[in-house]
Every structure is written in structure tokens, then in C-alpha cells.
């Protein structure tokens, strides 16, 4: 699960997204990764741990989770020492970075709806994303020849990804009702995602971290909660504050740079 830049300029050529990662399986696989362990040894162990009967599905799940090596990173330490809320935030803070449809849905659906809902005296159902809006979004993102079954599964998968980070509430069994909401991620999970991005963007302002960073886009916290997360990250050594021309700046902290950031 490496964090690399994603080019959305050609998003309309995407194929469907129908294969999903079982959250419990992913948590189990990462829990059994230890610093110094070879990838081959981890893969062999992971194959034994997964309950799926089919070898092809086990290989697919392992491929979704694996990285190039197992190191004593800040991410692994926080994950294995963390509570369930933190572990889920860390997992999806890495996993969804490389999913263009998640990023696009956040920017085109979730944040515009939150902006409408946060206005004084918002319109009725301002937080609602209507079914036809979902359909237009998915249709614009995928190739025109995607079968209807794959179209429906992709729509469901994107919704599930947004729900996993707390920005979408889904209700109803037949007609799905989807409402946006501000996420409340574990503070250190949020701070880690900010700090990881700061390794590639060496210096940014606190307003950027709270509103424009990938973590802010993904979890969509309110400004006061984002500030709390950043304070927690500084206290834990994931982030470091500095000042430039009387402006507070953020940098990746010493806790990110020892033993490998990822």
C-alpha cells in the first residue's frame, strides 16, 4: 500500500471497481507483519491466516495489502498499538490514496454537499446525495462499455469506501439513502496521513493541513476537530511546528522519520 500521486485527468477511462478488500482480513494481515520479516515469509503466513477457500481470492487480498517490505515504521507501530478506531483510520488513510474514484467522489460529491449543508439555514436535504447524482458521477467516471452489473457494483463500492472513513451515512435496504457528514477520525490516524504527505511536500501551513491536505479531503473533519488532530500529532512527534514570516508551518515530525515513515 504505497502512497503515490494519482493522475485524475484521464479518470473517464477507468474500468469498474468491483473487487473489495475485507476489512477484518486486512486488519489481520497487517497485525501479523513484523519488522525484519521477509515479504515471502509474510505472504506464506498470510495465505494460511485467510479464511477464504479459493487460492486466487487469497492471493488477491494479499496483493491489496502488501508493500515492498516490512519495516518498523510509524504507521505499523501506530496500527499495532492502536485501538480499533485508529487502526481503521490508518488502514484507509493509506488504501484510498491510490483509488481515483474515492478522491473524485470526495471532491465532486462529498465536499460540495457538506458545503451546502454547513451554510446558515441550509436547504432541506442539503446533505443528501440523490440517486441520479450518483449515477451521473459513476457514468462519467467509467468507460461507456462497462456492463450494468459492474456499474452497480462500482457505485456500491465507492459508497462503501466513503462510509468506511465516516463521511457518508447509508440507510435503507432497497432504495439506498446517502447523506454526507463530517468525519471524526482518530486524531493520530489523521495526523499520520498529514505527516506522510508532508514528506513529499516538505513545508505547509496549518490551514492547508486542516482544509486542503489529503487527510482533510478524505475524512472531512470540522475545522476545530482537525486542529485537535494536528495538536495530537505534534504531541506524538508525528508532526513538527515551525514558523516562517509569523506564519505557523507544519513539517513531518521526528516520529515519522525514524525507522521509516510508511
Task: Label every model-predicted segment.
Residues 1-3, 259-262:
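Short, low-complexity, intrinsically disordered N-terminal peptides in bacterial proteins
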Residues 1-124, 129, 133:
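Eukaryotic partner-binding/assembly regions in large regulatory complexes
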Residues 39-45, 117-144, 201-218:
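Short acidic, hydrophobic short linear motifs in intrinsically disordered regions
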Residues 53-62, 148-164, 219-232:
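Short amphipathic alpha-helical interaction segments
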Residues 65-69, 113, 138, 142, ...:
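Hydrophobic, Leu/Ile/Phe/Ala-enriched alpha-helical segments that form helix-helix packing faces
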Residues 93-97, 145, 217:
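Generic amphipathic alpha-helical segments used as scaffolds and interaction surfaces in large
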Residues 106-173, 181:
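Eukaryote-skewed repeat-based solenoidal scaffolds used as protein-protein interaction platforms
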Residues 169-261:
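Accessory, usually C-terminal, subdomains that scaffold auxiliary metal cofactors
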Amino acid at each position: 500500500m504505497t502512497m503515490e500521486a494519482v493522475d485524475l485527468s484521464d479518470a473517464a477511462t477507468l474500468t469498474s471497481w468491483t473487487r473489495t478488500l475485507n476489512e477484518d482480513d486486512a486488519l489481520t494481515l497487517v497485525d501479523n507483519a513484523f519488522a525484519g520479516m521477509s515479504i515471502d515469509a509474510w505472504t506464506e503466513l498470510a495465505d494460511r491466516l485467510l479464511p477464504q477457500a479459493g487460492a486466487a481470492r487469497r492471493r488477491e487480498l494479499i496483493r491489496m495489502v502488501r508493500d515492498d517490505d516490512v519495516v518498523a515504521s510509524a504507521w505499523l507501530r501506530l496500527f499495532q498499538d492502536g485501538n480499533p478506531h485508529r487502526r481503521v483510520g490508518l488502514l484507509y488513510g493509506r488504501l484510498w490514496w491510490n483509488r481515483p474514484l474515492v478522491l473524485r467522489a470526495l471532491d465532486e460529491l462529498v465536499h460540495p454537499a457538506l458545503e451546502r449543508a454547513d451554510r446558515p439555514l441550509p436547504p432541506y436535504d442539503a446533505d443528501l446525495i440523490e440517486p441520479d447524482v450518483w449515477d451521473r458521477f459513476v457514468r462519467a467516471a467509467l468507460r461507456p462499455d462497462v456492463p450494468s452489473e459492474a456499474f452497480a457494483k462500482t457505485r456500491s463500492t465507492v459508497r462503501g469506501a466513503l462510509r468506511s472513513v465516516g463521511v457518508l451515512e447509508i440507510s435503507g435496504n432497497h432504495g439506498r439513502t446517502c447523506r454526507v457528514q463530517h468525519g471524526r477520525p482518530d486524531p493520530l490516524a489523521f495526523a499520520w496521513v498529514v505527516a506522510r504527505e508532508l514528506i513529499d511536500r516538505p513545508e505547509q501551513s496549518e490551514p492547508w493541513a486542516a482544509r486542503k491536505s489529503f487527510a482533510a479531503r478524505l475524512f472531512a473533519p470540522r475545522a476545530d476537530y482537525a486542529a485537535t488532530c494536528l495538536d495530537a500529532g505534534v504531541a506524538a512527534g508525528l508532526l513538527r511546528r515551525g514558523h516562517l514570516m509569523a506564519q505557523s508551518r507544519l513539517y513531518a515530525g521526528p516520529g515519522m522519520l525514524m525507522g521509516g515513515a510508511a
